[in-house]
Amino acid sequence: MKDKAQNIGLRMVQEFASTEALSDKFLIFDNYTSPMEHLGTFAITGHPVKLDSLLIVICSEGYARLIVGFEEITVLENHFLIVMEGKPFEVLELSKNFKAELMCLKESLFELQGSHILRFLHLIRENPCQPVLASKKQEFEVLLKCLKQTMTDTGNKFRQQNLQYYLY
């Protein structure tokens, strides 16, 4: 990796992706309802970046090849990757048919959840790329749809509580 990673804030990602965000703690978007070039020019920067939030990539088609920390990882179809807050990563390659849901969220969103979230985060640090089990794929898709619908419902004053409920 290069000497210095570029720091990117959640607000910068929100503006670039033209998506709705929940304060400075959560946003969700995809790369297939908008042109691929839009995400591609952001994702393949030629240098490592660090986000000020967790990045979750849920690949539904194709693949992406990244370096996370010092480890090269390939996110395949029906896999998800979690990059911890502040960890440097670089996107090396995206397949032409790459489709993914992307979520950025601050660890502070989990403040009220106690020690079981900390155990989960520790597990993810050890194994950042996991398959979406076939038995859970439909459930995963419904959850993502609920998260997206909740984000677009800007008139709902309980939006943050609903998102936290879905994520826990």
Placement of each model-derived feature along the sequence:
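A hydrophobic/aromatic-rich effector-binding and dimerization subdomain
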Residues: 2-3, 16-19, 91-153
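A short, compositionally biased micro-patch
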Residues: 59-61, 76, 84, 94
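Tight coil/turn sites that cap or link beta-strands
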Residues: 42, 77-78, 86
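All-alpha amphipathic helical-bundle segments outside canonical DNA-binding/catalytic cores
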Residues: 153-166
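Short beta-strand His + acidic residue motifs that chelate non-heme Fe in jelly-roll/DSBH
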Residues: 65-67, 83, 89-95
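Short acidic-glycine-tyrosine-enriched beta hairpin
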Residues: 70-82
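Residues immediately flanking
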Residues: 61, 85-87, 105-107
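Generic protein-terminus/edge-of-domain signal
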Residues: 1-64, 73
